[in-house]
Structures are given as C-alpha cells and as structure tokens.
Amino acid sequence: MDNQKSQFNRILLIVLAVLYVLTIAAFSYANWVVDPEYMQWWRMLLNIPLLSIPLVLLYGSIYVLVIAWREHSTLGQVSPRLAKIIHWAPRLAAILIIFFVSLFSLDVFEMEASPLELLGGFLMHNIPSIGMLVLLIFAWKRPVVGFVAFLAAAALFAIFFVRGIYSLPNLLLFVFPILLVAFLFYVDWKWLKPQPPAQVDAAA
C-alpha cells in the first residue's frame, strides 16, 4: 500500500512539474510574440521567477489537495504530517498571492507625477492586496472564514480581471490560485480534527 501511495505521489508530482514548465514556456512565448523587441532573452529569464509565484502556488496546491483527498477517501483521515502541511498551506499560499498581486502596484512609480500622486496611485493599486491581507488576518485561526472570504475574492478577481479572451491568462495568475487558497482553507476546516487539550494529571 505504501509503495502504491509513493508511486502515485511521484507520478502526480512529475505531471504537475511538466505542466508548470509548459505553462512557463507558453507565457514566455506569448509575451515574445506580442512584443519580440521588448522581450529579450534576459527579460524572459527575469520574468520566470515572477511567473513562478502564482504557478508554483497553483500546481503545489493541486498536489496537496489531491494527496489529501486520496488519503481522506481511503483512510477516512489524513496523516499527522500531511495535516501540518494542510494547516499551513492556505496561510502561506495566501501570503504568496498577496505579495504577487502587490508587485503590480510598483508600475505606478514609472509614471511622471508628484510624490503625493504616486503615493495615492500606489495605495489605490494595492487595494486588492490590502483587502486580502485583512481577510487573511481574520481567517488565520478560522479556516471557515478563509474558505468563504477567498472564495469571494476569487469571484471578484474573475469579474474585474477576466473580461475577454485576452485576459484569460489572469485565470492562471490570479483567479485559480486564490480559488485554491479557498479550497485549502476548506480542507483545513473540514478534514483536520482539532487536537484535544492536554489532560491534567490528577496526581499533579
């Protein structure tokens, strides 16, 4: 049974790693086609770490969710080691996607404007990041809040940032990662049993 489990995990990891590489290649090629003069090889290399933030989050979350689902459906529970991963995964994933979204606000400083206008534009562009940070604070010890809040956040990102065929990449970069954060919170809420409090020794 353990050998089958390890083999399944290995195959799943390889498949998701291949999908990650193909997705990075597809994004790089699409950017090069749109503007071949701007997208030089060194700029493509710099874009890879940036694109890797949501994509590693995306495929990493899928890996954790599939492994958790398989263990839960087979054994009725998840192992203690996986339970720790599930507990921290949505919180760390939320921090990553908030950081990724906030990076786009740095474009404001390329504009020609007064310092006050730049600061105002920077804060305006960071409204989604600040909003998700507030949601994460409320959800940190309440997985059910995280599930509902990030599910709503994914829906809002889909409404405002996916409005046509040319904005479909935003599904992979924003909507799906945020949606998977919600699912990770759901698994933390529904599948992880709270640890019973330590029993007080009567002899103490």
Regions found by a protein language model. Give the residues of each.
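Membrane-interfacial, low-structure loops and terminal tails that flank and connect transmembrane helices
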Residues: 1-8, 66-86, 193-204
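Juxtamembrane helix-break-helix junctions at the cytosolic face
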Residues: 5, 132-145
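Alpha-helical transmembrane segments
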Residues: 10-25, 90-100
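Alpha-helical transmembrane segments of polytopic membrane proteins
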Residues: 12-16, 23-27, 42-57, 120-133, ...
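Juxtamembrane "helix-exit" motif on the non-cytosolic side of transmembrane helices
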Residues: 26-38, 104-113, 159-165
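Membrane-helix boundary elements
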Residues: 80-113
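Alpha-helical transmembrane segments and their immediate juxtamembrane flanks
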Residues: 86-89, 167-204
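Central hydrophobic cores of alpha-helical transmembrane segments
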Residues: 145-157
